[in-house]
Amino acid sequence: MVLTEVLFVVVAALVALYTWFQRNHSYWQRKGIPYIPPTPIIGNTKVVFKMENSFGMHLSEIYNDPRLKDEAVVGIYSMNKPGLIIRDIELIKSILIKDFNRFHNRYARCDPHGDPLGYNNLFFVRDAHWKGIRTKLTPVFTSGKVKQMYTLMQEIGKDLELALQRRGEKNSGSFITEIKEICAQFSTDSIATIAFGIRANSLENPNAEFRNYGRKMFTFTVARAKDFFVAFFLPKLVSLMRIQFFTADFSHFMRSTIGHVMEERERSGLLRNDLIDVLVSLRKEAAAEPSKPHYAKNQDFLVAQAGVFFTAGFETSSSTMSFALYEMAKHPEMQKRLRDEINEALVEGGGSLSYEKIQSLEYLAMVVDEVLRMYPVLPFLDREYESVEGQPDLSLKPFYDYTLENGTPVFIPIYALHHDPKYWTNPSQFDPERFSPANRKNIVAMAYQPFGSGPHNCIGSRIGLLQSKLGLVSLLKNHSVRNCEATMKDMKFDPKGFVLQADGGIHLEIVNDRLYDQSAPSLQ
């Protein structure tokens, strides 16, 4: 009798749960929005859940479904939560710029207790806290401040040249390597010095602390993939499931390192116009008014900004550099043109480039911009709709007779936009000429946004671009790159990654041909 009652309760609970999911999964059909039929319980995240495809590339596949080519939006289900993929350019502009006050938060979240550095950093922080810290950090990233950082970056550029030279000498002038790792060592050292005033020495020691923790951060193991999956698709469960964007050991490392640097900076009174100066200033500002609430009274809030600056700063630049070198190896004629432009400028500058000079290199800029089109590091943007008190909710008219509901997640498929033949001729072809001065005017603004758009765009885009350019200049100064047996013929992306990463890495041969060293004396 008891067993029968237990079975009845279990069956009833399962039926109720199934009915609830089915009810949720009929939402878009009931609202008259075109949608992709969901899988029971897990919605439209089956391939992501099984780690068969990354979410960014899955969004791209949905975007490119021929049945949906004329639709402005597509309804999907993030597990049981109804969400929207935005296809129309004007709607994207509305979300990111015009109606930003309704979409100022990301849908993804972190656990405020188990992962305070994840919860409090500029990427994830919400509402008024986001606006406050964004305003305080913006002065670090002005063109004037970035120009001041360039001299420090150049020192790391020289370290990269020497590291390549040492490896070449050990291998008769050429060697095969996974190029992303070298690029990550460079960008790690660069970010550490320009943001924190620390010599990370990753180029000298690939297992140095900063590089070791950075490598772990973006190595998408099953456990890391699970953390990102829950943070982006089940954000309400991050606390229950103890999800960590920043792992416990990384958080400990950042607290110890940044805390020490801040204390030393306060003790010495040294000013470097870097991120640490801003964090020290915020802490002093909070201490000056002890009776008033201030987010900087929370040390983790300050360390969180350093943590996200470091991780985002090295990953974006190293990815851009490695994808650029992959394309240069595939297109030797483009590589020659780029190296000739770099070499001519280096000869003119006596072996180095001023800030103004590197920014003036036209073909270098074209190559980097095209790399960011084909390989946007963050292949999608996520936002959460928020109703505004006293105002009607946002309508999707004239496209659909539907009004957004509070808490609805929306996804902007950046990779898909960057590869849409509606906006790009032969989008799968690597063609820097798209970004020539003559052709740049033809680009549809919202169809190209490697750093996002509007108030929530990437605050460090200037640094990221400059760092990528300097890294390429330093590497190509006396070295060429070419394909080897391990080089992928066609790029495949890691299906576990939430940022765009080559599956298995990018293996290239680096050849020390001493282009600059041989040409400089004869042209002086």
UniProtKB/Swiss-Prot annotation:
UniProt subcellular location: Endoplasmic reticulum membrane; Microsome membrane
Record SUPFAM superfamilies: Cytochrome P450
Topology in membrane: Peripheral membrane protein
Record GO biological process: insecticide catabolic process; response to DDT; response to insecticide; response to mercury ion; response to organophosphorus
Cofactor(s) of this protein: heme
Predominant location category: endoplasmic reticulum
Pfam families: p450
Keyword terms, alphabetized: Endoplasmic reticulum, Heme, Iron, Membrane, Metal-binding, Microsome, Monooxygenase, Oxidoreductase
Residues holding heme: C458
EC number: 1.14.-.-
GO cellular component annotations of the record: endoplasmic reticulum membrane
GO molecular function: heme binding; iron ion binding; monooxygenase activity; oxidoreductase activity, acting on paired donors, with incorporation or reduction of molecular oxygen
Function of the protein: Necessary and sufficient for resistance to insecticides DDT and imidacloprid. May be involved in the metabolism of insect hormones.
Family statement: Belongs to the cytochrome P450 family.
Protein name from the UniProt record: Cytochrome P450 6g1
Organism: Drosophila melanogaster
